Every structure is written in structure tokens, then in C-alpha cells.
Regions:
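Alpha-helical structural context detector biased toward long hydrophobic helices
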Residues: 2-355
Length: 355
């Protein structure tokens, strides 16, 4: 752990800028497991670790989610195309280099990759590698390393664009201004950034280990869950922009109890291991939170969010604790001392940060 700020590296799973809403003059309260709460600086609780590299998808897993997509979106070519685009990048070139795809399949995959995901220079490099593969030439390992690196850089570039837009929207929401959410691109950026963080935490990685241990299956189900989430969050953004079924709702906390935040900052209120709904709850300050999900469920299963009392805030804080792995954070020591709030899924540092 480092107390020094390094602007080139991500800080933990909750960026320092996000945590700043819980800090007074750069200081906030943190609780590790069942230990006593302690005062720390924003940068004192940040881990210098990049979190934007997606897990690689093996060929068998790729084929599994492809079949899943074909069954799910049978007869809806536009939706299938959109879905496959999301799961294809950046694994397509690994499949090509392994000789796993036919030429026609490669053409389809190439057609799905757009400038939104990858630069022209990277595309040109990958095309040269592809040409070498099909001419029978051996592609040097160092070239493939460059391709792999470019894949990661492409994702980083995409996420940085989402991140930049996210901070603008977040600043507005913290002021109580929801007008940025009237713009479709802003909605997409906000949903994509926040829900992608949900997929990149130690808690989520632990799910893969659990599946493998309990069912003697590799991470196919874990990958499928990730892909379903990734599809749903894009669908959520598209539908929300049309103001029909889904919405992003700013929730105000006027009780005498603050929202806390954890190292897994966003939770699905449904709480099932393989959830059927996307009832995503994200505190953005001690006094404000965001709900992303179906309008109907906000009026039924999650109606308490529309009229919070101290008991419901306490319940939401406990959900944050349940999802957290190592640490929870609060603006006031009293919030952590007066209740049995603690991170509920403690894992050794070596397991959490070795991936």
C-alpha cells in the first residue's frame, strides 16, 4: 500500500476522486474487517493497481456465449450483432492467431469492431498479423505481444473516455443536477463505467473461484454471467434514454444516518448469485445515491428508496458491507462505531491483488 499519489495508476476499486465525497480536508474513516475504525487520508486507502484489463475468454467459453447469444436473440439480427460485438473485442485476434476461426467468421468479427473500440493504427497492425497467419507464416511471439498490448490499450482508451464523461455527470449529480442524464451518450457512459467496475472487483473474481470449486467447472458460467451483465448494462442505457422501462434515479438521504461506501461500491439489490434483474445501487456521497433499474421495480420491490428512513439507510449500508471485501469507508467515525458495519468477505491480500 502506498500513501503517495501516482496519477498514472488507478487507486483501488473506488477511485480517490469518487471517495472524496466522504472526506473532510482529504481525511475519511476506514474500517478493515472487524478492526476498529481509523482515520486515514484519501491516498492512504488507495491501492496503486490498474483495474481495466478484462479477463481473457478461451475458445470454448467464447463458443458457449456465442450459442447463448444465438438462442437468446433468435430472429433479432441487430441485437445479436450488438451483443456479439461486446464479447468479441479483444479476444478475436487470439482466436484468429490460434486458427480457430474460418475466414468468413473472421470477416464477420472484423465488421463488428468499430473505431469506438480500437484505433486505426491498431487495426492495421492486427490486419497484418491476420494476413501472416493466413499466408502460412509464423507470427513471432513479440508481434503477438504487441497485439495483446494494443488490445489492452484499446480497452484502456475506451474506459478512459467513459471515465472522463462519468466524472462530469457525477459532479452534476452531486450538485443535484440530473440534466446530463437527458443525453443518451451520457447515460451510456455513466452506466458503462459504473457497472464495469462491478465486474472487476475481488468479490466478483471470487465468484469464479467458487463456481470452479463447487461445480468442477472452469469459469464458463462466470464468463457467461459477465457477458450477460455487459449486455444488460448496454441495453439498460439504450432503454433508459428512451424513458420507457429503465431509469437512473437520484436518491436523496435526508435521515440522520449517512451512506457508507465500500471497496465494491456498487451492488445489485436483488442479491442473487445469478440475478434476473439489474437493481443497481450506487452511493455517490453520504447524502446521495443512484438507482439504475426498472421503473416498475423501483415502485414495488425497491419502493423504500423513494422515501428513505434511518432503518432503510442502515439496511442499504449493510448491503454495501456484504459486498465489500477488505474495507468500508465513512465520513464520520460515529457511523462505523455505533453499528456492526464491517467488510463481510475478507480475503487475504495475496488472493485479492495477485490477479
Amino acid at each position: 500500500m502506498s500513501n503517495k499519489r501516482n496519477p498514472t495508476l488507478r487507486q483501488h476499486y473506488v477511485p480517490v476522486k469518487f471517495l472524496s465525497a466522504w472526506a473532510d480536508d482529504g481525511v475519511l474513516w476506514v474500517r478493515y474487517g472487524h478492526s476498529e475504525p481509523r482515520e486515514t487520508s484519501l491516498y492512504g486507502c488507495g491501492f496503486e493497481k490498474g483495474i481495466y484489463t478484462l479477463p481473457q475468454l478461451g475458445f470454448e467459453e467464447y463458443m458457449e456465449v456465442s450459442r447463448f447469444a444465438e438462442d437468446t436473440f433468435k430472429g433479432d439480427e441487430d441485437m445479436l450483432r450488438s451483443y456479439m460485438q461486446m464479447i468479441t473485442f479483444p479476444w478475436m485476434w487470439k482466436l484468429v492467431s490460434d486458427g480457430k476461426l474460418t475466414r468468413s467468421e473472421e470477416c464477420v468479427l472484423m465488421d463488428m469492431v468499430t473505431q469506438r473500440f480500437i484505433s486505426k493504427a491498431t487495426m492495421d497492425l492486427m490486419q497484418r498479423v491476420n494476413d501472416k497467419v493466413h499466408s502460412g507464416a509464423t507470427v513471432p511471439d513479440d508481434i503477438m505481444e504487441v497485439v495483446d498490448r494494443k488490445n489492452v490499450e484499446g480497452l484502456e482508451d475506451q474506459m478512459c473516455r467513459y471515465e472522463t464523461a462519468f466524472w462530469v455527470i457525477l459532479d452534476a449529480l452531486r450538485r443535484g443536477d440530473v440534466s446530463p442524464l437527458n443525453d443518451k451518450n451520457n447515460v451510456l457512459a455513466f452506466v458503462d463505467y459504473t457497472l464495469t467496475q462491478f465486474l472487476r472487483t475481488p468479490k466478483y473474481l471470487e465468484l469464479a473461484r467458487t463456481i470452479e470449486a463447487n461445480y468442477n467447472e472452469k469459469v464458463a458460467k462466470h464468463i457467461r454471467l459477465a457477458i450477460v451483465y455487459r449486455f444488460k448494462k448496454h441495453l439498460l442505457a439504450e432503454i433508459n434514454s428512451m424513458k420507457k422501462v429503465y431509469r437512473i434515479e437520484l436518491i436523496r438521504n435526508d435521515t440522520n444516518l449517512d451512506f457508507i461506501i465500500g471497496d465494491v461500491p456498487i451492488v445489485n439489490l436483488e442479491g442473487h448469485e445469478y440475478p434476473k434483474h439489474m437493481d443497481m445501487f450506487l452511493p455517490i456521497s453520504p447524502r446521495l445515491a443512484v438507482f439504475m433499474g426498472e421503473k416498475s421495480r423501483l415502485r414495488t420491490e425497491n419502493s423504500y428508496l423513494l422515501s428513505l428512513d434511518s432503518e432503510s439507510v442502515d439496511s442499504l449500508n449493510r448491503r454495501i458491507c456484504e459486498e465489500s471485501v477488505l474495507q468500508i469507508y465513512a465520513k464520520s467515525k460515529d457511523v462505523l462505531v455505533g453499528r456492526d458495519y464491517c467488510a463481510m468477505n475478507l480475503l487475504p491480500y495475496s488472493e485479492v491483488y495477485s490477479s
